[in-house]
């Protein structure tokens, strides 16, 4: 059913599942959302001539304004945000190589020498920059995101000569309903994402099913800041009522005042904000004030989630003023009866990663 291939990569195709649903592959990316057929009909329609008439009619029957519920506003907000992002921009004020160390190598407690050949789900990959960088470690990466921002991942492949394009697979889909088989990945990485879904815990639970026995699941979430969270939440009651495109323009206008605020906060030693460009400041505003959902959590709360889902070990990481990280490991088959434990010190693999940086 593919209409074109480049270097053996399928660029345009139609996928179907056992339940008879159809999903298009557009520009090399499977689009696994309920309304993907409708959104990409200009690409889909020419492919129908390659199908038997009854199957082509089945595809046409999948076009419906009520194709299924998912968080469309979040998709629109983050699609705009990642479209505004440019290759070379820092994310959260942190350069790409530092993000790989801080939000993957340090937290997961897996020795770097053991990473090649493992499958990692980058759950909420954004523009795909980190997904691409992870292939340099020998990881096979499923880069999953609700937004269209993952289309920019190809730009990062061009900028990262050590990245392996055969090891990264971009998929547009909903983390609340991950289009993946049970027990298919070794590591799940989700930094700054789950709190932007309607139900953080529910999304966490649905992702757990795709993890293999012995697998590792790392998340980073917002936490409540005394006073600050209350002010931010009050402002969000206004900003999240704006159309995403309107607020994106507001964020660009407000970026210079936001930069000035950060400069003053640093000068009086109230905060230690990293330096950012005007565009990076606008992106931060879009993330903080534009996302429809922004839930705050705590490490003890999240520890209970891991225990409920059968993890035997969990440990804290990346604790800072805005949020915190947590990482847990499922038992291997032979360790299923191990008691649950919270580990407060770095694991051996984490120390090894530090030595190799």
Descriptions of predicted regions:
Residues 312-316:
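A short linear hydrophobic-aromatic micro-motif
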Residues 226-236, 274-294:
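Short, glycine-/aromatic-enriched active-site segment of Class I SAM-dependent methyltransferases
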Residues 186-198:
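A short SAM/SAH-binding and catalytic strip from SAM-dependent methyltransferases
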Residues 201-213:
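A short glycine-rich, Lys/Arg-flanked "PGG" loop and its adjoining helix->strand segment in the class I
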Residues 293-309:
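Short alpha-helix
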Residues 1-121, 125-179, 187, 294-295, ...:
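Conserved N-terminal segment of class I S-adenosyl-L-methionine
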Residues 216-247, 256-263:
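Conserved class I S-adenosyl-L-methionine
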């Amino acid at each position: 059913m593919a209409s074109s291939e480049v270097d053996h990569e399928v660029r345009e195709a139609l996928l179907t599942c056992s339940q008879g649903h159809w999903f298009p592959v557009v520009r090399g990316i499977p689009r696994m959302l309920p309304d993907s057929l409708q959104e990409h009909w200009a690409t889909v329609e020419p492919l129908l001539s390659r199908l038997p008439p009854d199957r082509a009619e089945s595809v046409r029957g999948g076009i419906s304004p009520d194709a299924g519920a998912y968080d469309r506003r979040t998709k629109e907000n983050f699609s705009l945000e990642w479209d505004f992002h440019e290759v070379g921009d820092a994310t959260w004020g942190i350069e790409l190589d530092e993000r790989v160390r801080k939000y993957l190598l340090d937290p997961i407690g897996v020795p770097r020498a053991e990473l090649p050949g493992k499958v990692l789900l980058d759950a909420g990959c954004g523009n795909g920059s980190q997904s691409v960088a992870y292939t340099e470690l020998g990881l096979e990466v499923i880069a999953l995101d609700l937004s269209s921002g993952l289309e920019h991942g190809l730009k990062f492949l061009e900028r990262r000569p050590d990245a392996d394009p055969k090891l990264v697979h971009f998929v547009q889909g909903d983390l609340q309903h991950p289009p993946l088989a049970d027990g298919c990945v070794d590591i799940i990485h989700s930094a700054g994402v789950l709190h932007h879904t309607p139900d953080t815990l529910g999304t966490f639970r649905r992702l757990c099913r795709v993890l293999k026995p012995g697998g590792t699941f790392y998340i980073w979430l917002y936490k409540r800041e005394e006073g600050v969270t209350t002010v931010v939440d009050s402002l969000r009651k206004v900003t999240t009522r704006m159309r995403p495109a309107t607020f994106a323009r507001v964020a660009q206008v407000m970026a210079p005042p936001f930069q000035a605020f950060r400069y003053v906060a640093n000068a009086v030693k109230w905060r230690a904000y990293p330096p950012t460009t005007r565009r990076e400041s606008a992106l931060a505003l879009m993330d903080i004030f534009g996302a429809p959902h922004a839930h705050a959590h705590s490490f003890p709360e999240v520890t209970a989630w891991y225990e409920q889902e059968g993890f035997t070990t969990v440990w804290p990481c990346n604790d800072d003023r805005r949020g915190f990280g947590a990482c847990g490991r499922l038992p291997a088959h032979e360790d299923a009866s191990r008691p649950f434990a919270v580990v407060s010190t770095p694991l051996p693999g984490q120390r090894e990663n530090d030595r190799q940086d």
